[in-house]
């Protein structure tokens, strides 16, 4: 597939970064639709056909995957109203959109980030994942040391505890994974890479390599949700909420959502 992004995509995002203003954007929204949002929707449609071949558990649908350009500034010191990148995430079909691990793509004025994982999971999710890692660390190790994973994204990384998590011994064979508070794997490129003929093939290669990690991370969260769905009482016809939201995020240096 030829990349749907073009030099006009990057030119628009760079101009938006210099003019992060609602009035400026309103006057140029047709160009945004043509050169930024439209190409991403085209990409998501193609991924909707290709993703099920290796990640049938994940969603690629513009109604779910595409992030809005407008920022929520209510609790932020940064009052810039608009995001200066275009991004999409590919969450689990078995979890709410804002929960769990997924794949992620971002095209920004100076960079492209392709990868996935779990950026800022709530502590309840971290505990579930740690228990899953402790019981299945060999499976995780096989994923993140596999040839396709290492060649595509290098290593599993993220913020981690300086010591041993509560409830685990210091000589646990999976300690390096148990200390993680984030679970991230991805690769960064120059922004212009998004416009090349190699872009889509590389996107698929990285997504294919990271998808087993996403599936591993989501397994305990899906099981937990199924378990509480069976036991939680109904209130006004709806299940009581069980967890705070978590969502896929790129490394801190990669984006400001």
Regions found by a protein language model. Give the residues of each.
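Long, solvent-exposed, polar/charged low-complexity segments
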Residues: 1-15, 44, 145-146, 153-257
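Active-site acidic/histidine clusters and adjacent loop/turn architecture
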Residues: 14-69
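Short connector loops/turns at beta-strand edges and beta->alpha or beta->beta junctions
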Residues: 18, 108-110, 190
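Amphipathic alpha-helical coiled-coil segments
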Residues: 32, 36, 40, 126-129, ...
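Charge-rich, acidic-biased intrinsically disordered regions
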Residues: 49-75, 227-242
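Soluble extramembrane domains of integral membrane proteins
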Residues: 56, 60-96, 100, 142-160
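Aromatic- and glycine-enriched beta-alpha-beta binding-site module
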Residues: 74-134
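Compact, glycine/acidic-enriched structural inserts
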Residues: 107-168
């Amino acid at each position: 597939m030829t990349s749907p992004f073009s030099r006009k995509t990057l030119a628009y995002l760079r101009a938006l970064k210099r003019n992060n203003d609602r009035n400026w954007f309103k006057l140029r929204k047709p160009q945004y639709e043509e050169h930024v949002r439209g190409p991403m929707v085209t990409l998501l449609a193609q991924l909707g056909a290709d993703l099920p071949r290796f990640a049938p558990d994940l969603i690629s649908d513009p109604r779910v995957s595409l992030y809005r350009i407008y920022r929520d500034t209510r609790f932020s010191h940064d009052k810039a109203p608009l995001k200066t990148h275009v991004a999409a995430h590919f969450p689990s079909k078995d979890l709410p959109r804002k929960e769990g691990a997924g794949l992620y793509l971002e095209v920004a004025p100076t960079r492209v980030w392709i990868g996935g994982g779990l950026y800022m999971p709530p502590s309840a999710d971290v505990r579930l994942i740690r228990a899953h890692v402790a019981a299945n660390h060999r499976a995780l190790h096989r994923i993140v040391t596999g040839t396709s994973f290492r060649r595509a994204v290098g290593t599993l990384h993220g913020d981690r505890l300086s010591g041993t998590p509560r409830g685990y011994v210091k000589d646990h064979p999976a300690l390096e994974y148990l200390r993680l508070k984030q679970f991230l794997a991805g690769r960064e490129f120059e922004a212009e890479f998004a416009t090349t003929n190699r872009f889509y093939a590389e996107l698929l290669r990285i997504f294919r390599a990271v998808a087993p990690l996403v599936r591993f991370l989501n397994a305990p969260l899906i099981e937990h949700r199924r378990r509480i769905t069976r036991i939680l009482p109904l209130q006004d016809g709806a299940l009581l909420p069980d967890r705070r939201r978590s969502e896929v995020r790129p490394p801190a240096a990669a984006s400001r959502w």
